């Protein structure tokens, strides 16, 4: 194995450069630390124009807390599948059948404040149908 040092910056530093008049899509995949990062920043309180893609690990005890936090800030949740987006009312991360691991079939979840009509319209244009 080789160790490579990389520089990092706090998530809050990225957020300060966001223009409130533009729309953004932010993908966060920090191996189970999504709740800690999102709840420790002002992203949900200050930005109305940010959609999020978050990975939910099946064994993460913070999944429900993160899901509920985003719902309470006015986001709708959609499970991202090969067939398109499925609206969620609770986290629908599904374990792979007959495999002993933390891997899942679907782990990415799309959170948005856009209307369900607009999400379905975009889904239909990109995928061809709505689930």
Regions from the language model: what does each represent?
Residues 1-17:
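S-adenosyl-L-methionine
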Residues 13-131:
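Conserved acidic-Pro-Pro-aromatic motif
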């Amino acid at each position: 194995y080789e160790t490579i040092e990389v520089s990092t910056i706090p998530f809050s530093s990225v957020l300060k450069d966001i223009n409130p008049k533009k729309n953004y899509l932010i993908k966060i995949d920090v191996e189970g630390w999504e709740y800690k990062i999102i709840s420790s920043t002002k992203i949900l309180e200050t930005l109305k124009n940010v959609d999020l893609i978050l990975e939910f690990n099946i064994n993460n005890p913070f999944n429900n807390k993160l899901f509920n936090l985003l719902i309470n800030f006015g986001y709708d949740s959609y499970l991202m599948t090969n067939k398109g987006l499925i609206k969620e009312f609770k986290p629908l991360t599904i374990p792979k059948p007959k495999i002993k691991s933390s891997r899942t079939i679907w782990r990415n979840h799309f959170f948005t404040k856009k209307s369900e009509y607009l999400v379905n319209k975009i889904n239909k244009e990109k995928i061809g149908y709505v689930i």
